[in-house]
């Protein structure tokens, strides 16, 4: 069945939850640890549930305890649950810990949103330098480390976040020192390194382009609170810019999404920041941003591109935004057009011309961030809107409708009506 959000039309305060993009590699890292690992205040997301399923399938005890997740036990099987692995791109992160523990892993090629090419060649070439043999059999990927993992000096051709995380996980349990050059610098990398160090690892340089890791034979248990989600913060900041009002975002360091805040300020929003808070206010007209580009951290995040584009729809002059990371980032453009927006996709660039007023409409989410961007656009539209296929949004936002409602948005989650054929016939009582 389709899941839907119904939006009828933002002031308030929201405490930003833990970052999905940090929680997923952290759950994979728990495979390296002896004892019980507890992750604190984890948002209940579809992708997090998939990660828990992967851990359980590997033979670990992984379960929710309130808003925390505990992981215990050494993995006992090298085969990742194929249906779960195929649902989520981050399933590739579970390979390195299983290789370290068992010397072999079998999986299917990872899934994820269809936003463009997302190859895993950097993951595999780096692992090969650490002693891993790789072969593909159809959709299956089989990795082996017959002599175990060993340290290496690895230079990434592109600062891929996923490849950096994979190699960091492998290096933490490898024999000897590993040097990662050209590494991604995203704060989620630093969060993963902080967790590994908390568990007894030795990681230096995370957050820079060169990371040094001394492998450890054993990592220990700990409790860890993942960092706040800078993309959720970016989403709510863009919602305020699009619809107007005042929003205070707490618990998330503004420097982690500073490029987006700077662009919103250039567009006419008032932005005030503290050590772990930001207040975004838009009372007057919103202006176009000119030409904007995404990039690798610390540039504007690719995940924020559709959200910023949704805010640009409400501006009084033209904007364009180019995503240099993924070639099909703006699958939401068709949905924007349904609201009456004047948009055109040219290659990796979305061009936006001003219109007098967006109008409420029905639009379909085609991916995670694009789906959230449609909700942001709907907040700026006049009248009632409906967003369908919101299961995509559930992969990265916990209680999204409730979060926006607390800011004053008129939004509700609709459950689809059962058709006559779907209604269950009451069973007869048996004597």
Where are these regions (language model features)?
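Short, structured segments at the rim of ligand-binding sites
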Residues: 1-4, 8-431
